[in-house]
Curated annotation (Swiss-Prot):
Family in the record: Belongs to the bacterial ribosomal protein bS16 family.
A GO cellular-component term linked to this record: small ribosomal subunit
Protein known as: Small ribosomal subunit protein bS16
Database matches in Gene3D superfamilies: 3.30.1320.10
GO molecular function: structural constituent of ribosome
PANTHER family xref list: 30S RIBOSOMAL PROTEIN S16, SMALL RIBOSOMAL SUBUNIT PROTEIN BS16M
Amino acid sequence: MVTIRLARGGAKKRPFYQVVVTDSRNARDGRFIERVGFFNPIATGQAEALRLDLDRIEHWLGLGATVSDRVSSLIKDAKKAA
């Protein structure tokens, strides 16, 4: 099953997440199909905290992809800000 979820990156104690489309059987930070955005939970000042390609996300949702709980709330926030 294809899912849209977060893949963790960044350094220890400084998380940075890629929003990726992947097969649900793959490891969290493993192989993915497409990168559709990023989320920086510790962004401060002028740093961009969230960027999502909503067109590609809608495309994958139309093909039947599921969305993790956290990514679902991020999509909601991005749509509200747009």
